[in-house]
């Protein structure tokens, strides 16, 4: 393993992670409603969940998200390495500017070679982006970074440390498995992806880790077929993160409609995953979770507002939003319960 020379190691990575959605408490409802609308709450939560640094990472692969994949240009190994490093340095610089990042030494428990290499890569990248280095010093640090980043698979470990601060081997292994499944399995509906991450601690942060890792892979990918698979995985993960950003708003609406905890967000995802939403299907799902006709009608109103708010990228196509709203309003007009 390459030794790091003269790199400042007084860094606390766990101080730079973006704040996930906070738990909702019913006592907050009236006060929040008086200050800000439910729609604005949800929009703020979406923005908070995605974060500026992630958009910086995804900027280069915007063409892939729009379906305009790169032509089959052959990068040399040196060009691939340079692209990866430049993307890493941009991300590190952005995080430092946003949060004033520092790095804490690894504990003895973090003896995983991948994590140790990732720690050294982050420290080197931070030193290089800090500026004020002599040419010789910069050249020495760059040489060390070249050696470490020449090995494959460092990205996921780096992003895990940046986002979570402390990562163990089991967490890193589970992220590797999930990332490969996200790339390979293009048939699984979004609702099932959500159920796979539902019990994860720090699930928003972990999905962000996967997004950054897939974005990095796509940024240097040259095979058109692989570009398509990576771009599709990126879209799926981005949609999943957008829905996770609605969690706090869904908790608020669960309290308003007297629903069991953790039922509304899965319902939104199930609705989105229906190719065509039928009123009978929707009626069965809603009556299973409401306690009265009053709460049923209130839930319909909340869902109507939600689906008017949800960003376009959450839907399967440009017509789905309107079809869902039409079905919700059909149920509201025609159905009399209890």
UniProtKB/Swiss-Prot annotation:
Q: Which GO terms describe its cellular component?
A: outer membrane
Q: Name one Pfam family in it.
A: HrpJ
Gene that this polypeptide is encoded by: ssaL
Q: What is this protein called?
A: Secretion system apparatus protein SsaL
Single biological process term from Gene Ontology? secretion
What are the record keywords, sorted? Protein transport, Transport
Q: Which residues form a coiled coil?
A: none
Give the NCBIfam families listed for this entry: PRK15345.1, type_III_tyeA
| Signal peptide per UniProt | none
């Amino acid at each position: 393993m390459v030794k790091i020379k003269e790199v400042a190691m007084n860094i606390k990575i766990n101080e730079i992670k973006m704040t996930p959605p906070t738990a909702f408490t019913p006592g907050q409802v009236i006060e929040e409603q008086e200050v800000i609308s439910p729609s604005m709450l949800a929009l703020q939560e979406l923005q908070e969940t995605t974060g500026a640094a992630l958009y910086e990472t995804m900027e280069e692969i915007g063409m892939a998200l729009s379906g305009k994949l790169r032509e089959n240009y052959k990068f040399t190994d040196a060009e691939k390495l340079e692209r990866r490093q430049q993307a890493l340095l941009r991300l590190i610089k952005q995080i430092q500017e946003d949060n004033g990042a520092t790095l804490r030494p690894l504990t003895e428990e973090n003896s995983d070679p991948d994590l140790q290499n990732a720690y050294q890569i982050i420290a080197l990248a931070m030193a290089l982006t800090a500026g004020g280095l002599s040419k010789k010093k910069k050249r020495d640090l760059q040489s060390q970074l070249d050696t470490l980043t020449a090995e494959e698979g460092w990205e996921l470990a780096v992003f895990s440390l940046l986002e979570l601060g402390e990562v163990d081997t089991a967490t890193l292994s589970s992220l590797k498995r999930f990332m490969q499944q996200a790339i390979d399995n293009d048939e699984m509906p979004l609702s099932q992806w959500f159920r796979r991450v539902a019990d994860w601690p720090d699930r928003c942060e972990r999905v962000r880790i996967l997004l950054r890792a897939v974005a990095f892979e796509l940024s240097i990918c040259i095979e058109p077929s692989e570009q398509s698979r990576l771009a599709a995985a990126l879209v799926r993960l981005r949609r999943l993160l957008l829905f996770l950003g609605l969690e706090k708003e869904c908790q608020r609406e669960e309290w308003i409609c007297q629903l069991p905890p953790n039922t509304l967000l899965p319902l939104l995802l199930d609705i989105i995953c229906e190719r065509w939403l039928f009123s009978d299907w929707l009626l069965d799902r809603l009556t299973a979770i409401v306690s009265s006709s009053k709460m049923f009608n209130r839930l319909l109103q909340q869902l109507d507002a939600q689906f008017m708010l949800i960003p376009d990228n959450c839907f399967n196509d440009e017509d789905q939003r309107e079809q869902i709203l039409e079905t919700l309003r059909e149920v509201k007009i025609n159905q009399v319960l209890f």
